[in-house]
Amino acid sequence: MKLKMSARWVAQSAAVLICVFALKQYYSTASADQLKWILTPTTACVELFSGESFRFESHAGYISADHRFLIASSCAGVNFLITAFLMLSARRLLFEPPTSATWSFIPVSLFAAYVVTLIANTTRILIALKLQGISAIDSLDSNQLHRLEGIFIYFLFLTLLFLVSERNSSDGLYSVLRRCFLPLLVYYSTMLGIPLLNGSYRAGRNFWEYATVVFLVPVLVLCGLCGCLSAYAQLTPQFRLPAKSQRTAKLAREETNKFVTT
């Protein structure tokens, strides 16, 4: 039985990796026309919350009515979708009992990643619209600012997605915080590992500038989130102990009360 479960785990892990590399390969050659399945709903959300109007230009993307902003294939967020899917799948395979890992977690993780990608994309583009008139901040030019904003938003949403997926965990808050390194490792794997394997480092300074930002920003985001959650745990009594310890303490209090009343 153990061998069977191990074989299924290996097969599921292989299926997840096949999905990841298939999506990555598809995105590397896809045009804006082929990415309408994610560009169209993203643009609809942006129009809803910004009041801006966009129209689709074949092979280019969605362009604003004033021709100042383009939602192109690079704005599709497919890399984030891949990262979110891989993170959710890895969490299920690594942190949950093998008996609970049915094959349905793969399409469920993919759908959840798609929904969160739409939300993260919409947020990032709305902020980019607000920053549109800013040419530079301190030593950052518009391209660097756009990159910084994208990395910050995407990793923030990736970590929040992980925390939401852990909401039913029976472990304490501090155990969950320790596992928060999973989204960091997955993010590094897709945003740094795959480009390195593809030889992107040959681009020289541009790649290493990108790699430095990708390495540092998620660490700062994760430290900030962990700090906020730790502070919240200190202020909120029910989060001071792991869940199992809380149950033990509760049972002990109940037994003590019974003894006192008798």
Where are these regions (language model features)?
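Hydrophobic N-terminal alpha-helices or hydrophobic patches in metabolic proteins across all domains
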Residues: M1-T262
